[in-house]
A protein has these predicted regions:
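Beta1/beta-strand and adjacent pyrophosphate-binding region of the FAD-binding site
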Residues: 6-10
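Glycine-rich Rossmann-fold phosphate-binding loop(s) that bind the pyrophosphate
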Residues: 13-14
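Conserved S-adenosyl-L-methionine
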Residues: 26-32, 137-139
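Conserved N-terminal Rossmann-fold NAD(P) cofactor-binding segment
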Residues: 32, 36-75
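Conserved NAD(P)H cofactor-binding loop of Rossmann-fold oxidoreductase domains
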Residues: 81-83
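Rossmann-like NAD(P)(H) cofactor-binding subdomain of soluble oxidoreductases
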Residues: 91-156
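C-terminal substrate-binding/catalytic lobe of Rossmann-fold NAD(P)-dependent dehydrogenases
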Residues: 138-142, 151-216
């Protein structure tokens, strides 16, 4: 009986790639992680940092720096490459720079033999994910964007802080594009399974005072 090695390749060893790697090792979601970065020294440093961190975790994960040839037998590739917005820039303002980086990344993916699933975090996340799908000419179900998952988490945290309850009791989602055009489906927000609108009617002095525009 063969045992599958849960191998993940992370493209981009910067701030976001660092957090992705730590999340994977701390939750024992990967047996092996390979960092790929245009700055080889940064990828090596990141791999060493995470390897050191595994000393304090119950499960060991092999973390190395490599290149696209290491993606051939990986199941998941996480793309976290690209510039961060600076000054008054929005995520969309970085689109041109990110596309130039992703041209090289997608060309390397084609040559690598990688045949798994791609999760894209590079911003503007949804637009870049669409670009990757077309650049690779892959079925869309093989390429995912993190999209508004972070925004949804922030929304639940903000509601929880305002009314003083555990955010795990809240179901709320930011919808649309991870950027300036996203929106909140307030009619679908529930707390402990009860619609927020009902809470606001029953408890006007607490839930009723929530500033939905500010929270969104």
């Amino acid at each position: 009986m063969s045992i599958s090695n849960r191998k993940v390749v992370i493209v981009g060893a910067g701030h976001v790639g660092s957090h992705v790697g730590y999340a994977l090792i701390s939750q024992s979601l990967a047996d092996e992680i390979v960092y790929i970065d245009s700055d080889r020294a940064k990828a090596v440093a990141q791999a060493l940092d995470l390897t050191d961190a595994t000393n304090y975790l119950p499960v060991r994960t092999k973390v190395t720096a490599g290149d696209y040839s290491d993606a051939a037998d990986a199941q998941i590739m996480i793309i976290a490459a690209g510039p961060l917005p600076s000054g008054n820039q929005t995520r969309m303002d970085t689109l041109g720079q990110t596309i130039e980086i992703l041209k090289e990344v997608t060309a390397s993916i084609k040559k690598s033999g990688f045949d798994g699933i791609i999760v894209n975090i590079s911003n503007p996340a949804d637009v870049i994910t669409h670009y990757i799908q077309h650049a690779l000419n892959w079925a869309p179900e093989r390429i995912f964007s993190t999209s508004t998952t972070l925004d949804s988490a922030r929304l639940r945290r903000a509601i929880a802080q305002e009314i003083g309850i555990d955010q795990k009791s809240i179901t709320a989602y930011a919808l649309g594009e991870h950027g300036e055009s996203q929106m909140v489906a307030w009619s679908a927000v529930t707390i402990a399974g009860k619609p927020l609108s009902q809470w606001r009617e029953e408890y006007p002095d607490t839930f009723g005072k929530l500033d939905l525009d500010a929270l969104a």
